[in-house]
Amino acid sequence: MPADRGVPRRDGERIPETGKRGTMTNTQKELLQALRCFMQGDEEYHLPERFSQLKELCDLAAMHKILAIIYEMIRRDAVLLLEENAPLAAKWKKSAIAEVMLQVQRTAGFLELYQKLQKEGVHPLVVKGLICRSFYEKSDFRISADEDLLLRKEEFETFDRILLEEGYQRQALDLNNLPYEIPYRNPRNQVYIELHFLLFAEGEGAYGHLNQEFAGAFDRCICEQIEGVDIKTLSPTDHMFYLICHSFKHFLHSGFGIRQVCDMVMMAKHYTTRIDWREIQDKLAQLRMDTFFSALAKIGREYLGCSWEKTGYVDDTQECVDCMPLLVDLLEGGVYGGSTMARRHSANMTLEAARRGKKATASSVWSSLFPGVSYMKGHYVWLCKYPWLLPAAWVMRLFGYAADRKHTEDQSSLEIGNKRVELLRKYHVID
């Protein structure tokens, strides 16, 4: 198939070529095309005959944590059978198989744990992860690093006891002052759980207010059956709105990857009119997130094959929205915008701009270079015990950034930060 012909959709249409303003690479285009075929349930995708960026495609898939998905779609392709590509193809196959096997193990381990929690009268809501995976025909190819649970605080004591009895490990806790997020890891089956009492960090000025939008979520929850196990989760409207808000949160940090857009599309296709789209659109408009989601929806329609009309979602403004800058940003950023240290550091500028609701200032530049102790604790755990060593952490951070710059050609965190602040303005998040 010639490179400029694209790949046909099931309805005979083709992915549109990027316009003169588009800046996607050929590798990024092929990733999207293979990904869309996977989401549609196709058996395979064929790369262009003279495709020579196989290594770049593999690296990009790894950056977005969809290595197994892309390999599954192209494993029969002639490009992978070429002698010069044999070593890479073998390595890719090995990694893909390992990822899928680990996901199967993690899913089984989590379902076993969830049933034990239910028997003890503990009913956390499963958010994203397992639920999103279930929307895909080959669910274990859509890997998850963890399972997010939303729990009522009054159930924590029993929840914690059960997990510790099952061999899960966690950090020491002050039971009178529980943190926003409590991670548990089981070294036996590699299940990793992030427990939450709220969906967003309450003290974060840029998005902590989003918690109020989910008041009563437990009262509205539904039950999904996955592999024979009844799983409690958010209602279709709450869950779809949460996926948008979760992506928005990471957009305000250092970004998010294409997989989150895929999950939105798959959830919309699964629940269709069970989602109250009018309620979501009204909330998005009030929160200045409507243009942001219109761009995501346009990405879903033009590049991931989503017919939004069939889901009940109607957006008359979508045609006027330029989704390309957002698409390029999320493709370059990888999962949660973690593609480079410089990009991760830039998060402080976008967060500060969102808090202030305006363009980056000297204070946001300072925040990027020298973030507060609450942010730094996430990267230097010893600050939890020795917060007065914050200046030492700043020095280590700057040296780490300098080392990263020696091995990359990435823009500085300030340049990336300024560019991403402009994205916030473009999508009307800030003035």
Enumerate the language-model features and the residues they cover.
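Conserved NTP-donor binding/palm subdomain of two-metal-ion nucleotidyltransferases/polymerases, i.e.
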Residues: 24-145, 151-431
